[in-house]
A protein has these predicted regions:
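Flavin-dependent oxidoreductase catalytic cores
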Residues: 1-396, 400, 404-411, 415-416, ...
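Flanking helices and flexible, charged tails adjoining ferredoxin-like Fe-S electron-transfer domains
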Residues: 209, 378-388, 411, 415, ...
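Short gly/pro/ser/thr-enriched loop/turn and capping motifs at secondary-structure boundaries
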Residues: 267, 327-330, 424-426, 487, ...
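Short, surface-exposed connector motifs at secondary-structure boundaries
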Residues: 290-296, 315-320, 453, 520-523, ...
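Rossmann-like dinucleotide/flavin-binding elements
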Residues: 390-419, 461-474, 481-498, 503-561, ...
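Rossmann-like dinucleotide-binding cores of NAD(P)H-dependent redox enzymes
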Residues: 415-455, 530-584, 643
Length: 662
């Protein structure tokens, strides 16, 4: 076996997992909403199908999350799931039965989000141990009778979960949520028996664990999602050593069957983007493991490859690995590793756009690289069935949309030829991966190229497809994936375009700037009318090379980036020397000069001696071939940026659906 430690069984209290791969708890917003939108609902069929694919894909433990234990914590997301109501029990079975059907253990994460909550819809006060603000509103300090009530609700929720078929309970004591707040001296400033020294700060957690164990009995595993390090740079906070001390006490009390160790606090470091190193939380898991030798410890955070997971276990840093985004991207990650074909794993790139990015907009999660996420019943494992008739298909364009369409159609038995006018496949992914810290995005293209090769797609590089050359091959269907083009004259929701003077030769679009980064001159102005990564990334790239570069935008921040990505990308660029000018408009472009307008003060500023002005605005589709073909063939589809210039997740989804529709 390729990864013997990873695929060895693991004892977790009264249970045995078939391997050491844990699909970790996370928000999905796949719960079935209540009759009144905004009220908490229950887990159901959509979540059941989603977790079933991860069980079918080979994970040993599936931790369903996050599930709320009390009305005061049920409104952090629009579509939360409740556990305290006995009505949840049959809904739980709709999740546990599919997991068990494929031989995995079904765990559930029970949580009270404490001070991270807010009462915008519920109007309920935020409950926290102390008057320490941990979200957008100040909390109510918990009274003793309310603490007792919460202990009872945790136990009631656990009892319901066990009745619904869950094999294990994970109590959330991390990410800045309520039990974590009690554990930390940063957020627990109480002077009663629940505050002060470590034993007192642990008291609430001990009471919860004791009550939960009594509620579920000896056949159900009980453990913690434990804070491993708060990563507080500017004040007191729990460190890995503190986490080890806490873990040792829990282990000595015999209250935990496992410890799932993560670092950071909700909203500032929980879902690390592509810029973050792999294995970034392993040090904390290792510290906990050394302190709690007899308790299985799970490591988490950016563990993406089977080699990395096996190494953690081999070095004794943890007993199991918790994967979330890696299994969102590819549910079959475990089976592919077990079967000795890890090179076929569709990797998580840390893009964050569809998973964490959607959650921050109160939308169900998706995945840039896996179009099936959230649509698992329709597009998940086992749904890509052979076509009734094998057809001759031409795909024009070798970007992510075209590659996705090609491999999906070939997997269904069609005979596929892909034309790419350039000498390399990947399309605009190849530009995106040139931005600093974003090289891992290459897997969007590389995995699809591999699938095309494995499925027998004929690839013709350096071939410009025309309507006549396509028709000469007598295809049954054509998918036009010719992409889009950047332009300095595009439109923007945030600023009237084009900018006066942008027709001049020293004014270029952002793609030209990236290709010609070495020859833009000493002083560059970048105007960002979109609010995504391109302007910031290009600014960092140029600043690191010694260019005096200023990024100007009318926006207060890059609003189309999730806050985790923005929290890395913007500081990186500024620290490299990029000047950042938000709330600033590009008024006009003169002869190697620009006029800037502060949108708040309305003050003007003239800047001269500019070598290059770069404009990042919305692009235009390359749709000419589609319109030449659409009336000359019965089956012509266009996908991705050839429809409208959007993001990679839309392009890949378009390509996937087109490949299924041939």
């Amino acid at each position: 076996m390729a990864f013997p430690r990873l695929f060895s069984p693991l004892r977790i209290g009264p249970l045995e997992a078939r391997n050491r791969i844990v699909f970790g708890a996370h928000f999905t917003m796949f719960s079935e909403p209540a009759r009144t939108w905004g009220e908490p609902g229950f887990h159901g069929e959509r979540l059941g199908r989603y977790v079933e694919d991860r069980a079918r894909g080979g994970a040993g433990v599936i931790i369903v999350g996050q599930t709320q234990v009390h009305p005061t914590t049920a409104y952090q997301m629009t579509n939360n799931a409740a556990a305290w109501d006995e009505a949840a029990v049959p809904h739980f079975r709709r999740v546990t039965e599919p997991i068990h059907r494929h031989g995995a253990l079904a765990f559930i994460q029970l949580a009270h989000n404490g001070g991270v909550n807010f009462g915008a819809w519920s109007k309920l006060p935020v409950w926290a141990p102390s008057a320490v603000v941990n979200s957008t509103e100040a909390p109510k300090v918990l009274e003793r009778h309310e603490i007792k009530e919460l202990v009872e609700y945790f136990a009631r929720s656990a009892k319901n979960a066990a009745a619904g078929g869950f094999d294990g309970i994970e109590i959330h004591a991390a990410h800045g949520y309520l039990i974590h707040e009690f554990l930390s001296p940063r957020s627990n400033q109480r002077s009663d028996e629940y505050g002060g020294n470590l034993a007192n700060r642990m008291r609430f957690a001990v009471e919860v664990l004791t009550a939960v164990r009594a509620a579920v009995g000896p056949t159900v595993a009980v453990g913690l999602r434990l804070v491993g390090d708060e990563e507080q740079k500017y004040g007191p906070g729990l460190t890995a050593d503190d986490a080890a001390a806490i873990a040792a006490r829990f282990a000595a009390l015999g209250l935990v069957d496992f410890l799932n160790v993560s670092v950071g606090i909700s909203g500032i470091g929980m879902v690390r983007p592509v810029y973050a190193p792999h294995l970034l939380g392993v040090y904390a898991a290792h510290a906990v493991k050394q302190a709690a030798q007899n308790v299985p410890v799970f490591a988490v955070h950016r563990i993406l490859l089977p080699d990395e997971a096996e190494g953690i276990l081999e070095r004794g840093e943890a007993d199991a690995v918790t994967l979330v985004r890696a299994l969102i991207a590819d549910p079959e990650w475990p089976n592919k590793a077990r079967d000795g074909v890890p090179h076929t794993i569709r990797r998580c790139t840390g893009n964050n756009q569809g998973c964490y990015g959607n959650l921050t907009q109160n939308l169900p999660i998706t995945c840039v690289t896996n179009p099936a996420v959230g649509r698992d019943a329709e597009l998940g494992l086992g749904t890509l069935t052979p076509a009734a008739i094998s057809k001759r298909l031409i795909v024009v364009g070798g970007g992510p949309a075209g590659l996705e369409a090609a491999w999906v159609a070939a997997a269904r038995g069609h005979r596929v030829t892909l034309f790419e006018r350039g000498d390399r496949l990947g399309g605009k992914i190849r530009l995106a991966q040139m931005l600093p810290g974003r090289s891992e995005l290459s897997d969007f293209a590389d995995w699809r190229i591999g699938e095309c090769e494995r499925r027998g797609v004929e690839i013709r590089l350096n071939t410009e497809a025309t309507a006549n050359s396509v028709l000469a091959l007598s295809p049954d269907a054509v998918i036009v994936a010719t992409g889009g083009r950047a332009t300095k004259f595009g439109t923007s929701k945030f600023f009237p375009m084009p900018v006066a003077g942008s027709e001049q030769d020293f004014v270029i679009d952002h793609e030209q700037a990236l290709i010609r980064a070495d020859s833009l001159g000493a002083r560059v102005i970048i105007f960002d009318a979109v609010g995504h990564i391109e302007a910031i990334g290009l600014g960092e790239l140029l600043a690191a090379r010694g260019t005096e570069v200023t990024v100007v935008t009318t926006l207060p921040m890059p609003i189309n980036l999730d806050r985790e990505t923005m929290g890395y990308a913007l500081p990186r660029a500024v620290q490299a020397g990029m000047r950042w000018r938000p709330n600033t408009a590009l008024g006009a472009i003169g002869d190697h000069a620009v006029t800037l307008v502060d949108t708040l003060s309305r003050q003007f500023e003239q800047i001269a001696d500019i070598d290059t002005v770069v404009i990042r605005t919305n692009g235009l589709p390359n749709d000419e071939l589609y319109f030449e073909l659409k009336d000359r063939m019965p089956k012509v589809m266009r996908v991705g940026d050839a429809v409208a210039v959007r993001y990679a997740d839309r392009a890949i989804f378009d390509g996937h659906m087109a490949g299924r529709q041939v």
